[in-house]
Amino acid sequence: RAILNWQKFVFYAHNQVEKEANDALVLSIDLSKQRMAKLKNDPIAERDQTSNTAYNRAWMHALFGRYGEARKNLEDVKNINEKINSPTAMHGYNNLMGMVSLMEGKAESALQFFEKGNPDNTYFLYFKALALKAVGDKDGAKEILTDIANTNFSYWELAIVRNRAKKLLENT
Protein backbone atom coordinates (compact mmCIF):
# COMPACT_ATOMS: atom_id res chain seq x y z
CA ARG A 1 0.00 0.00 0.00
CA ALA A 2 2.92 2.36 0.57
CA ILE A 3 3.89 2.07 -3.09
CA LEU A 4 0.30 2.60 -4.24
CA ASN A 5 0.07 5.78 -2.18
CA TRP A 6 3.45 6.94 -3.49
CA GLN A 7 2.07 6.47 -7.01
CA LYS A 8 -0.98 8.52 -6.04
CA PHE A 9 1.35 11.22 -4.73
CA VAL A 10 3.20 11.31 -8.07
CA PHE A 11 -0.06 11.50 -10.01
CA TYR A 12 -1.66 14.20 -7.87
CA ALA A 13 1.51 16.28 -7.58
CA HIS A 14 2.07 16.33 -11.33
CA ASN A 15 -1.53 17.40 -11.79
CA GLN A 16 -1.08 20.15 -9.19
CA VAL A 17 -3.68 18.73 -6.79
CA GLU A 18 -1.81 19.66 -3.63
CA LYS A 19 -4.03 18.39 -0.81
CA GLU A 20 -4.44 14.94 -2.33
CA ALA A 21 -0.74 14.78 -3.22
CA ASN A 22 0.21 15.65 0.35
CA ASP A 23 -2.30 13.19 1.83
CA ALA A 24 -1.00 10.38 -0.39
CA LEU A 25 2.62 11.18 0.45
CA VAL A 26 1.92 11.31 4.20
CA LEU A 27 0.09 7.97 4.03
CA SER A 28 2.90 6.42 1.97
CA ILE A 29 5.46 7.59 4.54
CA ASP A 30 3.34 6.31 7.44
CA LEU A 31 2.89 2.90 5.81
CA SER A 32 6.61 2.71 5.11
CA LYS A 33 7.35 3.50 8.75
CA GLN A 34 4.97 0.71 9.81
CA ARG A 35 6.85 -1.68 7.56
CA MET A 36 10.14 -0.45 9.04
CA ALA A 37 8.92 -1.22 12.56
CA LYS A 38 8.65 -4.87 11.56
CA LEU A 39 12.27 -4.94 10.34
CA LYS A 40 13.61 -3.93 13.77
CA ASN A 41 17.13 -2.61 13.99
CA ASP A 42 18.07 -2.64 10.32
CA PRO A 43 20.25 0.48 10.10
CA ILE A 44 20.54 0.39 6.31
CA ALA A 45 16.78 0.12 5.84
CA GLU A 46 16.27 2.93 8.37
CA ARG A 47 18.83 5.11 6.58
CA ASP A 48 17.20 4.48 3.22
CA GLN A 49 13.73 5.17 4.63
CA THR A 50 14.88 8.47 6.12
CA SER A 51 16.57 9.49 2.87
CA ASN A 52 13.58 8.49 0.73
CA THR A 53 11.20 10.40 2.99
CA ALA A 54 13.29 13.58 2.74
CA TYR A 55 13.65 13.10 -1.02
CA ASN A 56 9.92 12.70 -1.60
CA ARG A 57 9.13 15.69 0.59
CA ALA A 58 11.69 17.74 -1.36
CA TRP A 59 10.15 16.60 -4.64
CA MET A 60 6.69 17.60 -3.48
CA HIS A 61 7.91 21.03 -2.37
CA ALA A 62 9.64 21.49 -5.73
CA LEU A 63 6.53 20.55 -7.70
CA PHE A 64 4.51 23.12 -5.77
CA GLY A 65 7.09 25.89 -6.06
CA ARG A 66 8.42 25.81 -2.51
CA TYR A 67 12.08 25.71 -3.50
CA GLY A 68 13.49 26.79 -0.14
CA GLU A 69 11.67 23.93 1.57
CA ALA A 70 12.81 21.56 -1.16
CA ARG A 71 16.42 22.61 -0.57
CA LYS A 72 16.07 21.99 3.18
CA ASN A 73 14.87 18.44 2.57
CA LEU A 74 17.54 17.91 -0.07
CA GLU A 75 20.19 18.93 2.46
CA ASP A 76 18.96 16.03 4.61
CA VAL A 77 19.22 13.70 1.61
CA LYS A 78 22.74 14.92 0.92
CA ASN A 79 23.85 14.47 4.53
CA ILE A 80 22.63 10.87 4.51
CA ASN A 81 23.62 9.77 1.01
CA GLU A 82 27.08 11.31 0.80
CA LYS A 83 28.17 8.81 3.48
CA ILE A 84 27.18 5.85 1.29
CA ASN A 85 30.10 4.27 -0.54
CA SER A 86 28.47 3.99 -3.96
CA PRO A 87 28.95 5.92 -7.20
CA THR A 88 25.18 6.22 -7.56
CA ALA A 89 24.35 7.28 -3.99
CA MET A 90 24.02 10.96 -4.90
CA HIS A 91 22.15 10.52 -8.20
CA GLY A 92 18.73 11.28 -6.75
CA TYR A 93 20.01 14.29 -4.83
CA ASN A 94 21.79 15.72 -7.87
CA ASN A 95 18.86 15.15 -10.22
CA LEU A 96 16.32 16.75 -7.91
CA MET A 97 18.69 19.60 -7.01
CA GLY A 98 19.08 20.19 -10.74
CA MET A 99 15.31 20.40 -11.12
CA VAL A 100 15.02 22.81 -8.17
CA SER A 101 17.83 24.99 -9.52
CA LEU A 102 16.19 25.08 -12.95
CA MET A 103 12.84 26.06 -11.49
CA GLU A 104 14.57 28.86 -9.58
CA GLY A 105 15.88 30.18 -12.90
CA LYS A 106 19.44 28.93 -12.37
CA ALA A 107 19.91 26.86 -15.54
CA GLU A 108 23.73 26.82 -15.43
CA SER A 109 23.69 25.54 -11.85
CA ALA A 110 21.01 23.01 -12.80
CA LEU A 111 23.22 21.60 -15.54
CA GLN A 112 26.07 21.11 -13.08
CA PHE A 113 23.79 19.00 -10.90
CA PHE A 114 22.32 17.07 -13.84
CA GLU A 115 25.84 16.16 -14.98
CA LYS A 116 26.34 14.39 -11.63
CA GLY A 117 22.90 12.75 -11.66
CA ASN A 118 21.64 9.55 -13.21
CA PRO A 119 22.26 9.88 -16.96
CA ASP A 120 19.51 7.35 -17.71
CA ASN A 121 16.61 8.84 -15.74
CA THR A 122 14.12 9.96 -18.39
CA TYR A 123 12.18 12.16 -15.99
CA PHE A 124 15.20 14.25 -15.07
CA LEU A 125 16.63 14.16 -18.60
CA TYR A 126 13.54 16.12 -19.59
CA PHE A 127 14.45 18.83 -17.08
CA LYS A 128 18.06 18.71 -18.24
CA ALA A 129 16.77 19.41 -21.75
CA LEU A 130 14.86 22.41 -20.39
CA ALA A 131 18.06 23.66 -18.74
CA LEU A 132 20.02 23.20 -21.97
CA LYS A 133 17.37 25.13 -23.85
CA ALA A 134 17.48 27.89 -21.22
CA VAL A 135 21.24 28.36 -21.68
CA GLY A 136 20.90 28.40 -25.47
CA ASP A 137 21.99 24.84 -26.29
CA LYS A 138 19.00 24.10 -28.49
CA ASP A 139 20.73 21.19 -30.24
CA GLY A 140 21.54 19.46 -26.94
CA ALA A 141 17.98 19.99 -25.75
CA LYS A 142 16.55 18.73 -29.03
CA GLU A 143 18.65 15.56 -28.89
CA ILE A 144 17.37 14.67 -25.42
CA LEU A 145 13.77 15.61 -26.22
CA THR A 146 13.86 13.55 -29.41
CA ASP A 147 15.10 10.51 -27.49
CA ILE A 148 12.31 10.94 -24.95
CA ALA A 149 9.64 11.51 -27.61
CA ASN A 150 10.72 8.41 -29.56
CA THR A 151 10.92 6.02 -26.62
CA ASN A 152 8.35 3.25 -26.99
CA PHE A 153 8.55 1.59 -23.60
CA SER A 154 6.05 2.24 -20.83
CA TYR A 155 7.10 3.41 -17.38
CA TRP A 156 5.94 6.20 -15.07
CA GLU A 157 8.79 8.63 -15.77
CA LEU A 158 8.10 8.48 -19.48
CA ALA A 159 4.37 8.82 -18.93
CA ILE A 160 4.96 12.18 -17.25
CA VAL A 161 7.41 13.73 -19.73
CA ARG A 162 6.93 12.12 -23.16
CA ASN A 163 4.05 14.30 -24.39
CA ARG A 164 5.71 17.37 -22.92
CA ALA A 165 8.87 16.55 -24.86
CA LYS A 166 6.85 16.16 -28.06
CA LYS A 167 5.22 19.56 -27.54
CA LEU A 168 8.57 21.23 -26.98
CA LEU A 169 9.91 19.64 -30.17
CA GLU A 170 6.94 20.97 -32.12
CA ASN A 171 7.71 24.47 -30.85
CA THR A 172 11.42 24.29 -31.71
Where are these regions (language model features)?
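TPR/TPR-like (Sel1-like) alpha-helical repeat modules
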Residues: 26-30, 75, 118-120, 138-156
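Generic long, charged, amphipathic alpha-helical segments
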Residues: 100, 105-118
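"A position-specific structural signal for the A-helix of alpha-solenoid helical repeats
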Residues: 3-7, 49-52, 56, 60, ...
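Boundary/linker segments of alpha-helical solenoid repeat arrays
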Residues: 1, 32-42, 81-89, 121-127, ...
